[in-house]
Design a protein with these regions (language model features):
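Charged, amphipathic alpha-helical coiled-coil/dimerization segments
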Residues: 6-8, 17-20, 46, 96-159
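Exposed, interaction-prone assembly regions rather than primary DNA-binding/catalytic cores
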Residues: 150-189
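N-terminal leader segment of winged-helix/HTH proteins
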Residues: 1-56, 183-189
Length: 189
């Protein structure tokens, strides 16, 4: 039986309401339960893709590059570096492997021939799509076990996990319906 998600914080009138529950940790205490849940959820989420990527001799870095090149054909290398928050040196090996294996191609920019724009090849698009379907299946299974509001609550949570100073840039890459959602601290950033 599904229950609805309440967005109101629990504020019991007395500690009697907490009988049978683990007391909340003081604000200064590490949130080990959430840290560990996040770790295990991430491990399993990326693990699905990792197993497929192993067939190609690729890893998570290849997945990240391929994902954003697939989602944004014509992405400039500088923009990819900014999205991934890595150095050009860190990107070079991974990008070279994707280029050499025929999953990504680089083209000169139309206005600036020195600029390199990245595009997925048909083979790269196929792999990116397979990876996205694999990870989407996990989301669908999980959301199928939760109330309908869980998807929006999860999206709000993940958006809130992004540094406020970077949130607008990330939001610009999201579908229009997701861009409209504002978090309270967005106004302060």
């Amino acid at each position: 039986m599904k229950t609805s998600i309440e967005r109101k914080p629990l504020r019991p009138a007395s500690t009697q309401a907490l009988v049978g529950r683990e007391p909340a940790a003081p604000e200064s205490e590490p949130m080990f339960d959430l840290i560990e849940l996040f770790f295990f959820a991430y491990r399993d989420f990326v693990g699905d893709a990792d197993r497929l990527l192993e067939n190609y001799g690729f890893g998570r870095a290849h997945h990240r590059v391929l994902h954003f090149v697939y989602r944004r054909p014509g992405l400039a290398i500088a923009a990819l570096l900014d999205i991934l928050k890595i150095t050009k040196q860190s990107l070079n090996r991974v990008l070279k492997q994707l280029l050499d294996a025929g999953f990504v191609e680089a083209r000169a920019g139309a206005t600036d021939r020195r600029q390199r724009l990245l595009f997925p090849t048909p083979k790269g698009a196929k792999l990116a799509q397979e990876l996205a379907i694999l990870q989407s299946e996990r989301f669908r299974r999980v959301f199928g076990e939760l109330p309908p509001e869980a998807r929006e609550a999860t999206a709000d949570f993940l958006l809130a996990m992004i540094n406020a100073s970077d949130r607008e840039r990330v939001r610009a890459h999201l579908p229009p319906r997701r861009r409209r959602r504002q978090l309270p601290e967005d106004d302060a950033a």
